């Protein structure tokens, strides 16, 4: 980007394009009120793997909410995610385990009880620091709002690992599908 690019300049910009369409608030409220209010996590399955797994509770495609995307991430012992970036922000509430993030080349350590914030347009990757225990995070994103405004952009920089992480715990690890006690 050059010296005069919008990225680094103080030029006036339009951040939100004009939006229009057929929209009845009464019909939309009726549709939303007819949607389920409780998502049964036990009935959902993890996807992805073998080093990081996701269970998507609320996704843009569901039409359940207008502004939120909520999912559970589980990282295998020593596991890592793909390296990627996106315009929407994300908050990771660490449920259990310990690990770290790398955001734009800077490492940030976390443990259970912490909240990791991924800012807009940040290239990031998530890592489980323990070679023996899994880690979990509840993730809340503003992705549907960006989709609605036609401003969503996401890019993968490094793909998701296709092989388990090193070590016997990681090689044998599968997402905890059958867990019944969620009080960690």
Task: List the predicted regions and their residue ranges.
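Conserved short histidine dyad/triad with adjacent acidic residue
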Residues: 54-58, 70-85
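Short acidic-glycine-tyrosine-enriched beta hairpin
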Residues: 105-121
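Short beta-strand His + acidic residue motifs that chelate non-heme Fe in jelly-roll/DSBH
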Residues: 81-84, 101-102, 118, 124-131, ...
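A short hydrophobic beta-strand segment most commonly corresponding to one strand
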Residues: 67-70, 91-93, 117-118, 132-151
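A generic "binding-loop/recognition-motif" signal
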Residues: 87, 106, 122-123, 143
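Glycine- and acidic-residue-biased ligand/ion/polar-headgroup-sensing regions
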Residues: 77, 88-99, 104
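A short, N-terminal "cap"/entry segment at the start of jelly-roll beta-barrel domains
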Residues: 1-66, 153-184
